[in-house]
Curated annotation (Swiss-Prot):
Gene name linked to the record: msrB
Name the record gives this protein: Peptide methionine sulfoxide reductase MsrB
The protein's Enzyme Commission number: 1.8.4.12
Cross-referenced PROSITE patterns: MSRB
Cofactor annotation: Zn(2+)
Active-site residues, as the UniProt record annotates them: 119
Xref: Pfam families: SelR (PF01641)
Amino acid sequence: MEKVQKTEQEWEAQLTPEQFRVTRHHGTERAFTGEYHDLKAAGTYQCVCCGTELFTSDTKFDSGTGWPSFWAPADKTHVEEKTDRSLFMVRTEVLCAVCDAHLGHVFNDGPKPTGLRYCMNSAALKFVPKS
């Protein structure tokens, strides 16, 4: 998969201020404020920056956290994980494998079959309804 690389100025011109803050500066939207936290429609969730398919509605679940949550990515090679030691804690950050956009974090408190909870920011996603 070929990497997408742009300057900060190019990303800022392409994205809304909130999308830019979340995806390019590792921000987090406030709980229960994101567009997709309670969306139940069938479809796919793409990276808002580059359009890479990240998650599907088939793996989405209500975690009660106020952020869109999934128990698995659409394709494991479309996301990357790295250790995040910010805010005086250790978490696992989830990034788009194509453009390095910050998507959210993954935790080990999700449902079966994976036991994982990919806790994503709506601002990092673009929903495409199933046709």
